[in-house]
Amino acid sequence: MPAKHVAAEDDVRAVSDQFYSALEAMANGDASSMSNIWSHEDDVTTMHPIGGREQGWDAVRGAWEGVASASTDGTVTRTDQVIRVIGNGAYELCTESASMTLAGEPVSLEGRATNVYRKEKGEWKVVHHHADYHDEFAEIVANMGA
């Protein structure tokens, strides 16, 4: 694999590390660091374990903030990471594991995730996150009115 390609994968991996740190912060009540690593364009999307789909930075940010407002004691990790770079785009496949207290209820989940990145003004940004649907997580969020 050419050195330039490996370097690009390393750059995306660094942003992924920041994203998973931000996910863990969100699982502890603080979604503010998401703003630094996500694109703020209208075409960004997310499909969380709670179901549904958000499109546009304002909707995506709102979903993260809604979950963060009811989350404490969280840990989020990933395994089985695969990253591929294609020009100014990249994707990541992995398995996510998370546990937290959500709206007073302890919840744990493990599932597949896909993240998509785009290079904007020389920096890699998250433009899409998709995690497997999780019944218990979705039910708790639905009951809290998020």
Each predicted region: which residue ranges?
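Juxtamembrane and targeting peptides
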Residues: 1-6, 22
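A solvent-exposed, acidic/Ser-Thr-rich amphipathic alpha-helical stretch
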Residues: 9-17, 25, 31-87
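Hydrophobic/aromatic beta-strand elements that line small-molecule binding cavities or substrate pockets
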Residues: 64, 78-84, 95-98, 112-118, ...
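Short, cysteine-centered beta-strand-loop-beta hairpins and adjacent loop/turn segments enriched
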Residues: 71-73, 99-108
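A short, structured loop/turn motif at beta-sheet edges
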Residues: 83-91, 105, 117-125
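A short, polar/proline- and glycine-enriched secondary-structure boundary/capping micro-motif
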Residues: 103-105, 136-142
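Short beta-strand edge/turn micro-motifs at domain boundaries
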Residues: 110-139
